[in-house]
C-alpha cells in the first residue's frame, strides 16, 4: 500500500538540511523509549489486509499505518477527542517522533474526520490488533511473564453513551421536531407542526415534575403524545406519494417515533435516545447513580500487575455469567502471540453457575472447597476495580461518542489499548528511576550511604 509520507531514508531535498527530531528531544523520554519497543512493522503487516488497497497509478496515497495507529493510541492514552489529538500532535515533538516522523512537522497530520473512517476500516478485529500489540510489547519488555498472564480477573461495567438523560417529555419533543425537520427537508407540507405548543408543553411537564405535581405532569405528557401522533400520521399519509428513496430515509425515523409513542414506563427494551436506539438502561447498585444508559462491557486484566488482556462490548445487557466464555475466548486470541492460554479466571458472584472448559473459575461462593492459596488469589479480585476507574476517568470509557453498536465495540477496545500504553509508559519511567537509584548507590561508598551497623555485606 502506498503511503503519503516518505520513509526516513527517502527525505525530500527541502528536508535534508532540517534538524532531525532525534537531535531535538530527550531520547530517554518514556514515549521515545516506547516508540523503539512497539513492533510497528508487525502491526502494519497485521492491519494492511484490513485496509483498502491503493493503486500505484491513481488515487491519493493513504496515510501511514503507524501514524494512524499512533494517533489512536495517544487519543485514548491522554483522554482527547479526534480534533484535540491532531492539534496536540502539531505542538508536541515527542508525539510526532512516536508516530514515525523524522523532522518536525508544521501541519496537522490529517483531518480529524479521517480517524473516523480509519476506525471503520479497521473494524473490531483491527482494534483488537492494536490492543494485542501492547500486550506483546509488555511481554517482550519482560514487564509481565507468561505465568502472570495465565491468571486473569474478569469483571463487567457500563460504557455510557453520549446522550442526554432520557425523560418522556424531552424524547417526545425531540421526536416531533425531527419529523417536522424531515418533512421540511423533503418538501412535504404538514397540516400543523405545533412549533409553539410543543416546546411549551415540554417546559410545563418539567416544571410539574420538579414540583412533584405528577398528575399535572402526566396530563402534559398525554397532550405531547397526542401532538406527536398527529404529526406522525400526517407524515405517513403523505409519504406514500414520495419516491422510494425518500420513503426509506424517513421510514427509519417514523419507526423510532412510533416505538417512542407506544412505549410506557414499565415496558422492556425501551427507546432512550432517538439517535441511538442501541442504548440500554442498566442498574449496577450505585447510590450516586442508580441507572446508567449505554452498553455492558467486559474487562479482563492480569491478576497481579493489572495489564488489560481483554475488553469487549456485550449488547443486550446479558447476565454477567453468560459473558464469561466470550470474554475468555477473546483473551485467548489476544494472548496467542505470546503463547499463553488463560488457565485461572477470578470473578465475583455475578458469574456463579458458569463453567468454561479448560479454565478454573474462582469466586468466593466456593468457600468450602477453596485452598488457602486460592483464597489469596480471590482477595486480588478487587484489583480490577481501579483499572475500570482509570479506564473511565483517564481513557474516555465513561462516555462513548461513536455511532451505533459498532462504535461501542471499537471504543472500548481503543480505551483498553490507551490504558495499556499508559501502563507501559509508567513501567519505563519506573525502570528509569530504579536505574538512577542503583547508579547513585553504586557511586556512593557504603560507609556514607549506611550507618556502620547497617553496612551492606558483599
Model regions and ranges:
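Flexible, glycine/threonine-enriched loop-and-boundary segments that flank and lead into catalytic domains
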Residues: 271-292
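Basic, low-complexity intrinsically disordered segments
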Residues: 2-4, 46-146
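Active-site- or DNA-interface-adjacent structural scaffold in DNA-acting proteins
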Residues: 102-278
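Short, conserved catalytic/metal-binding motifs centered on acidic residues
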Residues: 29, 69-71, 85-89, 109-115, ...
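Charged, often Cys/His-bearing segments associated with DNA-binding zinc-finger transcription factors
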Residues: 1-49, 424-458
